[in-house]
Amino acid sequence: MIGDDFKAQHPDYLRLLREDPRRAGAAIRADYRAWFAQAEQYVRERRGDVLIEGAPGSVEELFDSALPYAASGYPVELVVLAVREADSRQATALRYARSLQIGLTPRFTTRSGHRTCFHALTDVVAAAERHPAIAAITVIRRDGRALLRHEAGGAGSASWALAAERARPYTEQEAAAFFRLHHGLWRALPRHRDELQEMVELARPLMPPGMQPARIDRPHPSLGPLPVTLRGAAYDASSFFSRAA
């Protein structure tokens, strides 16, 4: 189950998306969360298998969903996606741009909404690996590679694996892919370039040395602008979206 499926059933959601794609979800949150809770109860009562996708904004939000399953005799396992903050934010922009490209009316997560869920995950994992109701936690990379599996009472730190992957330096290939996608999004989302630049600044400290910003450690003489040959205006930013992960 995923919250977006319940949002889409709300009679006001499409209108709210057209008016404000960044806050439409928050406007109907109470309704779709209530429906989601009812669906969870329906599944538990019928002993159905269930996989829930979500981005909890707090420890309490996770446990409000997970603990009723444990109390009903379900083994509860978490799969945690460990992604750098810049990559995570860029992915939200990519989903938004792709949806616009095919004529949909998509949502676009706000800075503050992303920040809340991204940083809450640290607390969520720390609490979950200590809680007896959580049978196991598996931390995976963006490409699906498992980094660590922590089982209740066992060794291993899911919190450490999450933090380490989030702080992992980019390889040359990853850095090149990040900037290729950035350039495509820059052309596709001109109204959001301030946020796209924020994503670059988040990524910079983890970039290979050749892609780090220049240090300003001594005064330099004034320099005039150099002639730069621009790429053709016919450049198609959508080509990035069709290839990007």
Predicted feature descriptions by range:
Residues A55-G57, L81-R84, R142:
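An acidic- and aromatic-residue-enriched active-site/binding cleft used to recognize and process polar
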Residues M1, E77-V79, T138-I140:
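Hydrophobic/aromatic beta-strand patches that form the interior of the parallel beta-sheet core
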Residues S72-E77, A133-A136:
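Short glycine-/polar-rich loops that comprise or flank the Walker A/P-loop
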Residues M1-A66, A70, L104-F108:
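Conserved nucleotide-sensing/catalytic segment adjacent to the nucleotide-binding pocket
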Residues E19-P21, Y74-A120:
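A glycine- and Lys/Arg-enriched "phosphate-lid" helix/loop adjacent to the NTP-binding pocket
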Residues E129-A245:
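C-terminal accessory extensions appended to soluble enzyme cores
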Residues A8-Q9, E85-A91, A146-R149:
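Switch/connector loops and helix/strand junctions flanking conserved nucleotide-binding motifs
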Residues R98-I102, R111-A146:
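Metal-dependent DNA phosphodiester-chemistry modules and their immediately adjacent helices/loops
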